[in-house]
């Protein structure tokens, strides 16, 4: 065990090791809440379907406007300041959920949590890219995702027990975990932002430098839209698919996390030498099959197969895309590039629940997921066609600056 600790210490930098710890702590408590948030709001707001969807849409809708500012903040003030502020805001929001009773209070707290996420995600990803050699970035992102999945494995099971006992305990534990992470980061987290980056003013001011990452954003929307639906409307759609839907959701969440924990690093390491074109082709095929799987899964076996296929897609694709963006971005715009790309999650999670709720009530859940399967195939073909231009022209141009 001591040998393993020294191996981790020598292989990964201090910011990376701290991120490992924080990811494990917060993923466990966050996973207790994730599968049940929609159901909790659904019950608290007298069985309404659209009101929970509206509240959940507010956070990512606000994030759309906040994320670009957050990327600029992390590039100007530094990664450490942005991360500490983010953790404090998220801890305060989760504490508020313990006492919230009215719809407008839930909405305010959801937006506050979104501000924290908008700051944390680009800052933490930029810090990983700055403190890790390029040859090891995909590995580090994969390990972080695997650690996150480790927390997700146990989180839903504990969350179901707490939800049946008293749901507010879930929020209290999440708030405590975020605050502990904040305290340790305040003591141990170094600043990794370059003190004197080689800034090219013309490059910074030009909108054209963002075109490649905007293209990635656009063609990643179907992926994030699939996640938006599995996190919201699928929770309600599953009521019609399974008699014991709470147990099925819990088993699905735990199984998917376990698949990710086991498969994440081997899949990333095994595909490092593949071209981005091949990686993205595999990724979008897997996501398209998973979307169709959600539409037709009527048994636990089918649902677990869907989870496994989706895990392969996200393990291969999402991790390599993070590394790809770190190569794409000029050093002085790294935080903003991660922020811009991350907008696709906010866009999907702002319009997805509302659009999905309307389709669910009008046409049924199958229509949502079959339509997403078609969109994913189309986006995947488009991205595999254009990705070679980004690899051979844009990255070469940026690296010469």
UniProtKB/Swiss-Prot annotation:
Name of the protein described by the UniProt record: Uncharacterized MFS-type transporter YhjO
PANTHER family assigned: MULTIDRUG RESISTANCE PROTEIN MDTG, PEPTIDE PERMEASE
The family this protein is said to belong to: Belongs to the major facilitator superfamily.
Membrane topology per record: Multi-pass membrane protein
Gene Ontology CC: plasma membrane
Keyword Transmembrane (UniProt): yes
Coiled coil: none
Membrane-traversing stretches: 20-40, 49-69, 83-100, 104-121, 140-160, 167-187, 207-227, 248-268, 289-309, 357-377
Recorded superkingdom: Bacteria
Presence of keyword Transmembrane helix: yes
A molecular function (GO) term: transmembrane transporter activity
Alphabetized InterPro entries for the sequence: MFS, MFS_dom, MFS_MdtG_subfamily, MFS_trans_sf
Main location as per UniProt: membrane
Keywords (A to Z) from UniProt: Cell membrane, Membrane, Transmembrane, Transmembrane helix, Transport
Localization terms from the record: Cell membrane
